[in-house]
Structure formats: C-alpha cells, structure tokens
C-alpha cells in the first residue's frame, strides 16, 4: 500500500494496478510508533489506537488484495488491523466494525463479511458492525442477491442479510436469482422462495444453476431436459437429451437424441434445428460459438454460420471483440481446493456455466461453491498452455494467437509480443506500434505508448496513430500520472507532458508518481514538489528525505527519520513524529 518515491522497476510498471481513490472518503494515514501501527486523520489526530502489529486497507496476501479492494463500492472506507494473529475492521474514522477476532475471512460482498474465529466456526458481520446472525456455520458462500448459502453439518440452507435463516435441511442448493432458488431434498429438486416456501415441488432429478430470463432448466425422471417458468409451469416440456443451463439474449442450446445441438427461444420454438457437434458459448452480440463438422465458428439464432473461427477455444463477444485461444494440454503443479459440490459448475456440450459467481480466493464460483478458508494443497493437475487472440463480429482477426503472447484487451487496444519484441494494435486491428520494440508500456489514460528500441533507448508514441512524441534518446521514460512523464537523460530526470513537450531540463535524481497535480522530485537537497508547469510548488526549510504523493490535499514527508503530514502550501498539519507512514 505504500506510495514511496523509490524508483519503480520495469517489471513493477508492467504489473502495476491502481485502486481508484474516492475523494469523498475521509483522509486516513497509517502510522507506526514503537513498532506498532495505528491511524491518524487529516488533522493528525489518532483515530485508530497505535497498538496493532499490522494495519492497512487489506491485510490479505499480495496477489489477493486487488480483488479484495474492488469487491464492492465503499470497500476502501474500511481499514483492517491485526493483533497477535487475529484481525478486525475499522472505519476510516476509527469506529470498530468487526472486532479483532478472526483468523481468516471472505471479501466484503453486499455489505457483509464472513469471518472464521478461533473456534473454526464462521459468522457474518455487516458494515455497521452488527452480526447478521448469532448462528455459526461450518461453511458459507458470499452473499448473492441478498442471500448466502450456509452449511451446518451435512446439510445446506440460506441466511438473509437481515438475519433470517432458511434452515439447513437440504442436500444441495443453488444461489438465489430473482427471489427463487433450486434446492434438493430427499433426492429430488424443487424451487423455494426467500422464506423457504416451495413454489415448485421437489419432483425433478436435476436443475440448472438459476433462473435466467424467467426460465430454469429442469431434468425429469426420464432424464430429459426442459425449462420451467417462475410458477413451475413447464413452458418447454422436458424432451431433450441435454440443454444449456440458462438463456442468453433470448436463446438456449438444446441437444436431441442424435447428440446434435440447436437453439430454442424462451417459448420453446426451435430456431435452429440440432445440427452442431457442440455449442461453445452463450449468445452475445447475436452470435454463439459452435462446433460444426467443418470446425468451430459463430452461428446466428437461426443456425446459419456468420463466419468460421477454427480455434481451440471460443469465448463470447464483449464490447465488439471475442477472445479466442489455441493451446495444448500439459501437466503442472498448481494450488487447488477440495471439490465441494452443490451442483453448480456443469454445462452441456462445451458450453460451461457462464453465469460466473466470482471470486478467488474466497466465496465460490464454478467448481468451488462453498467458502472454506485455509484449505489448499498442491498437486499435479492437467492444465492448458494457451495463446490468446481476438476477433471482431465479422470474424476479422484483430490480434492473432500466432503471436507469442497477446495480453488482455484494453479499452483502446491490445499489447502483444512476438520473437521477443512488443507491439500494440488498436481495437480495429490496425498496428499502431509494430512488434519491433524490446519493451512497451501502455498508458491508455493519457493515450501514449512508452517504447524501448533496439539501442535500449526509450521514446514516447501516440496511441492514436503511433507518431513519435518524444524521440528515442532516453535511458528511461516513466508515466507519472496527470499527463506527466519522467524522462532520464544520463543520470538525471526531467519532466515532459503527454504531447512530448519538455517541461524541465534533466535536473533531478529521482521522480515519483504525481498526486493531485503535484509531482515529487528529488535533488541533492532532498525531495520537493513541482507544479504541472514544472515550477516548485512551495518553498520549505526542512530537508525531506522521502515523501508520498499528495492525497486529499495532504502528503507525507520524512525529516530526520520521522514522518509527518503537510498541506499543499507546505504547512505542517502533523509534525514529524512517526517511524513510518502510509496514506490509505
């Protein structure tokens, strides 16, 4: 969480992710004194006692923190603290939300958090600090649509956000969707509402994951599949060997006795007779990935092929592009979890359940429906080494999987590499930067590419048309935010803007990320701050040996080994007194 002015490595820049700050949140900084952590507000007053071993927005493992902090709106108003191996949560103003009591937890979801205490039982807290229920459970899911799946002993039930419980009496359960959920009792599946009342009697051998577009897939005692509506009426009577779990864009996939697949609409009308070897994706942008006798492609609802796309894996379209993959199976050791099944995580043909209940590492999703903290093992499992590519809705290749690597598509384009060189294409498939660069960093916010040539020199390119903004004559270029860039010439740094205008000569020993329009720079006399025009923001008498970027009008400064806080005029709002400081 620290935002120090230490120089970032190229690897760190490539891997960096940013959690957006909420300007409406109260300013809070973690401070360290005598080896213990607490927190202060924008006036320098202690709001969380300085008595904890660790303190931060998230104390999860580093590779889990991004998902933790992005789990829901308002998550960054909460601060986690740890003492003697147990953790809890406070608000930024210091109100206790969850007492220091748990060993492990879920992420916050729908304003609720699952925690496991020393007794190994799991309970839920709300953001207002109240327990959702006094009951404890052996396993739980995240909340989804106001209900969490809970397990006590060998049976499952539900817990509502208001503390109401649907008693754990079921063999298996699904998540609620639109107020209804499928449950299994005495070997048969039915549908209950949020009070636990059956709205569809348990008469089915199996069901789909959830209601979608008003329909739920059901399997009768003759092993035939169809769909029911919310009242339990068999709108599409069970007559198919298999069906897709859910409808998408008004269509579902069905398989007949010939083991061929076709499409139906929500009223059961066959729009494409069974003809495909498999249906690979749900409908998106009017197209569904299918496997034909001639290979893979994308089909329209009437079964006509829009275009062939003969890749190993097809995915749904998103924002006009579909990911495609080619790869081969290998075996490697990966971290895995125990397979606890309550029925989610299956599909028909090659169309797996696309209704994704995130997340890693807590909660459940496809193949891991119950949150069970702390149980991991390492074992060899089959995996797929794949090469990603992208195509558009006409089948045009935007980024070919023939490249050595194609990175995830961004809002403006796609980074790729081939033969040890990097390039970048826009979302229309036009090469803005050909694969000739030994290093390439993307800055979509400012619309530029930071590129490194064969001579190990860095330059700046426009993301719009690839024209050169800064010449390839620098040892390094770094994106500093707020439309500013640091360029390194010899052993000194200068500042340029996103149009390539040099705002300062190379005068500085180091530069750091800008915060609220002010840029930290280091000279032989220590750190100071520059305005966007490259002028000193304010004079200061003390020598700052380290600083943080500004946030909510304040920045941390280190003087003679101690940290304090200043405002944008350079005035101290908290004198230097602490061993360490992190703006949260």
Predicted regions and their residues:
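Residue-level detector of conserved, function-critical positions
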Residues: 22-584
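Bacterial N-terminal signal peptides that target proteins for export
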Residues: 1-7
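Bacterial N-terminal signal peptides
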Residues: 9-17
């Amino acid at each position: 969480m620290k935002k120090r002015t230490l120089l970032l490595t190229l690897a760190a820049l490539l891997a960096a992710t940013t959690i957006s700050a909420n300007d409406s949140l109260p300013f809070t900084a973690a401070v360290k004194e005598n080896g213990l952590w607490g927190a202060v507000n924008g006036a320098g007053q202690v709001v969380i006692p300085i008595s904890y071993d660790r303190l931060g927005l998230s104390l999860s493992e580093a590779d889990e923190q991004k998902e933790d902090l992005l789990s829901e709106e308002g998550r960054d108003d909460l601060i986690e603290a740890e003492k003697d191996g147990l953790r809890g949560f406070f608000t930024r103003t210091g109100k206790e939300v969850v007492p220091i009591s748990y060993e492990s937890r879920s992420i916050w979801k729908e304003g609720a958090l699952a925690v496991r205490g020393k007794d190994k039982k799991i309970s839920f807290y709300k953001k207002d600090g109240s327990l959702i229920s006094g009951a404890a459970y052996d396993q739980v899911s995240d909340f989804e649509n106001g209900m969490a799946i809970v397990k006590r002993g060998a049976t499952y039930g539900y817990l509502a956000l208001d503390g109401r419980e649907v008693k754990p009496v079921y063999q298996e359960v699904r998540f609620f969707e639109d107020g209804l959920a499928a449950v299994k009792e005495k070997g048969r599946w039915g549908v209950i509402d949020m009070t636990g009342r059956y709205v569809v009697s348990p008469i089915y051998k199996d069901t789909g994951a959830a209601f979608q577009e008003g329909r739920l897939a059901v399997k009768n005692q003759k092993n035939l599949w169809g769909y029911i509506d919310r009242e339990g009426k068999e709108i599409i009577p069970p007559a198919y060997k298999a069906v897709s779990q859910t409808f998408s864009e008004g269509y579902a996939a069905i398989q007949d006795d010939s083991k061929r697949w076709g499409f139906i609409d929500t009223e059961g009308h066959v729009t494409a007779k069974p003809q495909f070897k498999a249906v690979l994706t749900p409908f998106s942008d009017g197209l569904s990935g299918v496997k034909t006798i001639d290979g893979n492609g994308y089909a329209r609802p009437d079964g006509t092929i829009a275009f062939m796309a003969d890749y190993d894996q097809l995915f749904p379209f998103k924002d006009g592009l579909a990911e495609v993959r080619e790869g081969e199976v290998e075996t490697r050791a990966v971290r895995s979890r125990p397979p606890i099944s309550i029925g989610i995580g299956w599909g028909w043909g090659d169309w797996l359940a696309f209704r994704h209940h995130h997340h890693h590492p807590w909660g459940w999703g496809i193949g891991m429906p119950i949150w069970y903290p702390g149980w991991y093992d390492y074992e060899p499992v089959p995996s797929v080494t794949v090469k990603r590519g992208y195509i558009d809705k006409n089948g045009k290749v935007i980024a070919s999987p023939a490249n050595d690597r194609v990175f995830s598509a961004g809002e403006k384009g796609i980074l790729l590499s081939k033969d040890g060189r990097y390039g970048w294409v826009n979302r229309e498939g036009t090469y803005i930067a050909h694969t000739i660069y030994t290093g390439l960093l993307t800055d979509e916010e400012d619309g530029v590419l930071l590129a490194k040539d064969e001579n190990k020199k860095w330059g700046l390119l426009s993301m719009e048309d690839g024209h050169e903004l800064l010449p390839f004559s620098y040892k390094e270029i770094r994106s500093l935010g707020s439309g500013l860039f640091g360029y390194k010439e010899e052993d000194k740094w200068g500042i340029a803007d996103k149009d390539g205008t040099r705002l300062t000569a190379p005068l500085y020993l180091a530069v750091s990320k800008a915060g609220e329009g002010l840029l930290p720079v280091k000279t032989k006399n220590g750190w100071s701050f520059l305005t966007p025009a490259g002028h000193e923001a304010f004079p200061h008498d003390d020598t700052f040996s380290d600083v943080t970027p500004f946030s909510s009008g304040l920045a941390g400064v280190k003087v003679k080994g101690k940290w304090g806080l200043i405002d944008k005029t350079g005035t101290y709002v908290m004198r230097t007194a602490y061993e360490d400081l992190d703006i949260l």
